[in-house]
Every structure is written in C-alpha cells, then in structure tokens.
C-alpha cells in the first residue's frame, strides 16, 4: 500500500480512500487467534450450519478492520490518528465474500485538524454490510 503525502489543507469534502479484500478461511482462523474470539459461529462449520446463517461468518470486527486500512490511506503522510469510529453491522460476511471498504470525508473541522468521515463496507453483490462514521485527526506537516 502507498501512503501519499497530503497536507490537511488539501482535503476536500468527497475525498475518499478504498480498500478491497476477499475474506478467506485463514482470515477467520487468524482473527480468532489474534482477537481471542473463538465463538463457534466463526470457527466451527458444524455448529454454524445449525444457525440462521447456515455457514460460518466473519467476525464483525474482522470486516470492520478493513476500515483501518482506508482511514490510513485517506490520511496519508504525515499520518494522524483515529479518534472515534461508530459501526452498524447490517449483513453477515461469509468466507469467499469480497469486501470493499470506503472512507469518505463528509466534513472538515479545521480548528482541530479533524475530518468527519462516512465509512462503508460493501460485498461483491453491492450490499452494504457495515456503515458508520469515523473522526480522524491529521498530524501537522
């Protein structure tokens, strides 16, 4: 990934960053190991088949973590920090789904070098699986 240099003053409403990834079986297992979330819906196919989902689904936070990539891509260099992130999980994500995460600037708050952003994650069918809002603070040059 490339993180281009971008000054705070160069941001405009509508600026966006995108990252896409296909969710794999290994992603679920690695995320379960790293996060400690070993809930059977994510790691046990036999159990997951008995649920309303019919198969294992990705952890919500695994899918949401793609927004960390888009937030960083949007900020560029010098970077910044995420101050807040709200999320609504709208649809399940299955192994094999290809997700597209987007962070888009909706408001510029110059007094504290902050950006209010809309964040979305959609699947390969164009269905919105996560929506939310991020508050990012850009570092000075």
Outline where the language-model segments fall:
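Hydrophobic beta-strand-centered segment that forms part of the acyl-chain substrate-binding groove
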Residues: 49-58, 62-105
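Ser/Thr-centric signal marking residues that sit
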Residues: 22-24, 63, 98, 119
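HotDog/MaoC-like acyl-thioester-processing domains
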Residues: 2-13, 92-141
